[in-house]
C-alpha cells in the first residue's frame, strides 16, 4: 500500500545517498527532476490526499501544486521546465469520492478512470487534455514541448489493452501510435526525439 515511502537522491554510482523528504507515514514517491536539475516534482499524501508537490533539489522549499480531491501523480517537466504534465483521477460522485478516501486511509487506490492534465510549473493554468473516461496514464513530453505521449486503453471496450497515443498540449490532434493487443506503456523519448523507449508485454510468452 501507500504507507511510508520517501524520496532519495544519490550519485549515479550510488554514493552520497540522501533522504530528501523524511516524512514518516506519508507516501512520497513518483519523483522526477526538472531539466535544469534544480527542482523535483513528486506525489505525496502528506496533506491527506494524493497531490503533486515540487521541491528544490536539496529537499527544501516544498510547495503543493494540486489540491483537487483524488489522485494526482506521474508528473514530468516539459523540456524547457515551464510546464508539468501529469495524470489524475478526480472522483466527483459523492459515493465514489467516499470510497476513494476510505481506500486511501488504508494505503490503497483503485482508480479506473484517469485523465491527462498539464499545468504551469508553479501549479497555475491547469488544463485537462483527455476526457474519454478511460485509463490514460504515463504521460511524457515530446522533446519539442508541443506534444504529449501517453498510454491508454481508450480503444478497448474491455479496458485490457493499452496502447501509446500522442496529443498536442492544447488537447487537439490525438493520434494512436501503437496497435497491440496487450500492454504498451511508460513511454519516454530520447532528448533528440529520434528514439522512443517504452514497456511492453509483446514479447512475453503465454506460459
Language-model features, listed with the residues they occupy:
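A flexible loop/linker signature enriched in serine peptidases of the S9 family
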Residues: 1-7, 19-28, 43-52, 66-72, ...
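Residue-level detector of Asp-centered blade-edge/turn motifs that repeat once per structural unit
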Residues: 35-36, 79-80, 143-144, 191-192
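Hydrophobic beta-strand positions that form the internal "hydrophobic ladder"
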Residues: 40-41, 84, 148, 196
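A structural signal for short secondary-structure junctions
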Residues: 142, 157-159, 188-191, 204
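A short pocket-lining beta-strand/turn micro-motif at the edge of beta-sheets
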Residues: 173, 183-185, 192-196
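Short loop/turn segments that connect beta-strands within beta-propeller blades
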Residues: 11-15, 56-60, 120-124, 168-172
Amino acid at each position: 500500500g501507500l504507507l511510508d515511502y520517501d524520496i532519495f537522491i544519490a550519485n549515479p554510482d550510488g554514493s552520497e545517498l540522501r533522504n530528501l523528504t523524511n516524512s514518516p507515514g506519508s507516501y512520497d514517491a513518483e519523483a522526477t527532476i526538472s531539466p535544469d536539475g534544480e527542482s523535483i516534482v513528486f506525489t505525496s499524501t502528506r496533506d491527506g490526499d494524493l497531490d503533486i508537490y515540487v521541491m528544490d533539489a536539496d529537499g527544501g522549499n516544498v510547495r503543493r501544486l494540486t489540491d483537487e480531491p483524488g489522485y494526482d501523480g506521474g508528473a514530468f517537466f516539459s523540456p524547457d521546465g515551464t510546464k508539468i504534465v501529469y495524470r489524475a483521477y478526480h472522483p466527483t460522485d459523492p459515493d465514489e469520492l467516499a470510497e476513494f478516501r476510505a481506500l486511501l486511509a488504508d494505503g490503497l487506490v483503485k482508480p479506473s478512470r484517469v485523465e491527462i492534465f498539464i499545468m504551469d510549473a508553479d501549479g497555475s493554468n491547469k488544463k485537462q487534455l483527455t476526457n474519454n473516461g478511460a485509463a490514460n496514464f504515463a504521460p511524457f513530453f515530446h522533446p519539442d514541448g508541443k506534444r504529449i505521449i501517453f498510454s491508454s486503453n481508450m480503444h478497448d471496450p474491455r479496458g485490457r489493452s493499452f496502447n501509446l497515443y500522442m496529443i498536442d498540449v492544447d488537447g487537439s490532434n490525438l493520434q494512436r501510435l501503437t496497435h497491440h493487443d496487450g500492454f504498451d506503456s511508460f513511454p519516454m523519448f530520447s532528448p533528440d526525439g529520434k528514439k522512443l523507449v517504452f514497456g511492453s508485454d509483446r514479447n512475453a510468452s503465454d506460459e
